[in-house]
Each structure stands twice: as structure tokens, then as C-alpha cells.
Amino acid sequence: MSTTPLVSTAPLLSAEELKVAFPGRRGAATARAVDGVDLDIRPGEIVALVGESGCGKTTLARSLLGLVPPTSGRVTFGGAPLDYTGRALKAYRKRVQLVLQDPSGSLNPRHTVYDAVAEGLRIHGYAGDERAAVSDALSRAGLRPPERFFLRFPHELSGGQRQRVVIAGALVLEPELIVADEPVASLDASVRGEILALLLRLRDELGLSALVVTHDLGLAWNIADRVAVMYLGRIVETGPVEQLLTAPQHPYTRALLSVLPEAEGEPVVLAGEPPDPSKVPSGCRFHVRCQVLASGEAERAGVAEACRTVDLPVLNGGGDAQVACHWAAACGGPVEAATS
């Protein structure tokens, strides 16, 4: 679990009422992939965006990166609205870098390590000492001495080394924020801890911020300052990592935690699959799979009808513990943003 204090309380990156929708084929309903999200990331902060496959977290990350323009809402960086066109977007992408989950797919097999890391410098017209910048980035990523790796090709490296090359390619541009999409999912268990430790060290040494997209709450515990749990296009619970993972309020968060190896009690088996984002249920979007509603607990708390029919407002993007859940509100959970 990350414990480094934040450098600043002013957000570096903010999403406000962000929505991303994709039109359906042949007149089908629009898919609401991101359906109203507020999210702040502060300088030096690591935020884990957690949820099942298909919940919208990768689409949200791509929109924050400037790769997918929002349907509505806005993204700001350093207080300025993100311009999704032209030179402004190119300059933004230098400051915000992406690290993908599959290093083999991220690296051109015909390019040497040196060329892979130097590519960003060349795209952005770097006028300094290219060799020195590449060497420094490889060293920071844990590939030392860097000169030993210059002429190697991706197939000559281990999985962990390839991921370090990808990270070096992001670091070489001296970004302020890294978006890491499942950064250790394709790696052996023995290597995952090394890459997570590297990301934490880079935050401590460089003041980097990071958004880590993952389905694994265990990973979030090891690396994040704050967690945002996403379900069907919305963040349904957010807060400091220790508070959220030791005292989760939302039934969905509880279900995700219940399947971790160290969890006590029986795992929660959710009914069915996540609904189609083109057919978002009325009321709480989780209610059709909710174990609390199915067990009768919501009925006993007097909120079952609200669960089925009353939508919940978007949680604000700040760092306080918040949950969008009628049942949690009835039980006294931290839901001020969900009742405004």
C-alpha cells in the first residue's frame, strides 16, 4: 500500500461529468461506455481504476489520454481544458504517457531497444542529447548498464525487461502522468512485484502521478493511494485505498474483494454478466446483480424499490470516501455526494 504524502491538493488532471458513447450498428441503441464520471488525479498521486472487463475503465483511460474525444463533459490538465485537436493534443501527449499491459504488442519486433525508447523523442522533435536521454530513461526503468540493451531486440528480452523498455519509452519524454493499463497482467508473478516497486520508486523520485487501470484489487492495495471502483460506465465507490479495501461500502466492491485469496468467508458469486452498456438498467445500475438486493437486505433496509427505480448522482472526483448506493446510505455509509 502506498503511503507517500501528496505534493499538492490541486488536481493535475480532472474529468468532469465525462461521457463517452458509441453509436450502435444498424440502428442499434447507443453504447454508454462512460456514463458520467468525475475523477481527479493530483501531483504525485497513484489512483487505481478498478472493475471487471467491459465496465468502461479502458475507454475512460483512453479519453483521459486524448485518444477518444468525450461525447460530453470535459477533461482538464493543469487547470486548462484538454484540446482534442492539433498541436495542443501532441503537446499534451508528451506530458501524459501510456503504458500498455502487453509489452510484446507495444514494441516493434524490428526495432532495437534504443530505437524503441528514442521513438518518442524523434516524434516530438527533441533537440537535446538523444543518447543521454535514452540512457537515463533505461537506467530509471531498471535496465543497467543501459548500453548493454541498446542493440537488443524485443525477442532477446524477458517479459519483465520488455515491460521496463515500455516504461523507459514513456519516461524518456519526462511526463507528469502515466496511464498504466493492466501494467503487470501479462507478467509472471515473480516479476509483477518488481514492476510495481519500480512504479512506486518513480513516483517517489520524479513526483510522477499515475492512473493504474486494473481488474485486480490486490494490485490496487499494493500500489495505489486511492481507488475508484467502476461498474457499467460509472464510478460506484471511491476513497483512500486502506479505507475502501478494509471497509468497503458498495456491494460490488465487496464482491470484488471477496474473491481475493486472503479474503475471509465465502466468495460472492454475482448473478449473470455485466449488462450491455446500450441497455443500462433503471435505478441503480448494479441492482440486477446485487447480492444485497437478492438476499432481502435492501428490502429490510427499506430501499429495495429505490434500488430498482432511482438513479444515483455522479460521485465527485475528490479524494474523500464516497459510495453511490441506496443501501449503503440507509446503513450510514459515506454517501454525501450521492445524495446531493
Regions found by a protein language model. Name each.
Residues 1-246, 329-340:
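ABC transporter nucleotide-binding domains
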Residues 25, 30, 238-340:
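Short catalytic/signature loops enriched in Gly
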